[in-house]
Amino acid sequence: MFDHILAKSNGITLQQHLEDVAKIAVCVAQNVGLDPEIARMGAHLHDIGKASPIFQERLKQKNLPPCALVFRHEIASLFFLSLIEDVKKRQTITRMIIAHHKSVCEDIGDKGFLDLDDIESECFSYHSKDFELWSKEALGILKELGWQVRPISIEEAKSNYDETLAYCRSLTP
């Protein structure tokens, strides 16, 4: 149903990628004494922002022109955090999503989540472009993966983004 939404340029679908990552994450969590449910949820959410048409289009392009703001799929993935009701689980999964490519801040090249602070409003606007459309497909994928889903408005997505900013700021000295 969602085979047109890819995770990688090699043709693997986003849904398959999230299923594969979840299997590995659950196995690792069980073997090291961590919560497998949190591992599964984090694995499912970590790349869900790849459902954005911006990411999908950039995935198809071979020679990408340099642009002022690179699409960071992990930022778009944050828009779905309110599907997790438990605050502690949500905070743990927030760290998983934010840190799976870059650090929270002072990343090499100043590309950590908090390093984007000076372009905060532009960052949200860019990553949430057409959210009302692509979020339906992202939620459809999550539903196929066994999640209880509900519509997420652009306002709720912004609230999730703002909550993540506040939480990440609380982690830094």
Stretches with model-predicted labels:
Residues 2-8, 14-173:
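Accessory nucleic-acid engagement/destabilization modules that flank
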